[in-house]
Amino acid sequence: GYNNIVLQDGMSIKRVIDANERLQVWADTINNATFNSSPLSPLEKYLLAYKYVTRFIYNDAENKTVSRRVSSILNSNGNNIVCLGYAALLSELCKKIGIPCAIQYLDDATEKYARHANAMVYLKDEKYHINGAYISDPCFDSKQPTRASKHIHGMLKLNDAEKIYKNLNMD
């Protein structure tokens, strides 16, 4: 069978399928969740997805073939993940729960923000009167060895995100 087929990056097809199944379990959990006996709204689904992603601990002693791809991250139990990996994982999970989300690469003329990625999520939720695009940076909110995950950078308005990134020391 496919168990012995290895992809170019050295991961077997079986491990890719296993990772996709794990991601689908998360998506099914979110899609089937209820609050006060009602299905979750789009915002509530997104916040739950964000919580799943931010529970991984950032590891900057990265392996470029592991820390950026969803299947590799999930097969390493999140032990190897960097900003692009967080953005990719959030983007894939959001797509599975019906929320538009894309990876966004930060770059500017000074290259101060080069080599950082986050996600752009579009939320339309009548329950909370939300309709717009938001920057989401699960890397900055990720769990750390000394603290739990937080949710400060989960839904930044575009103009607020610009202010925050200008004040960051990313060196």
Which residues are covered by each model-predicted region?
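Secondary-structure boundary elements
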Residues: 9-76, 130
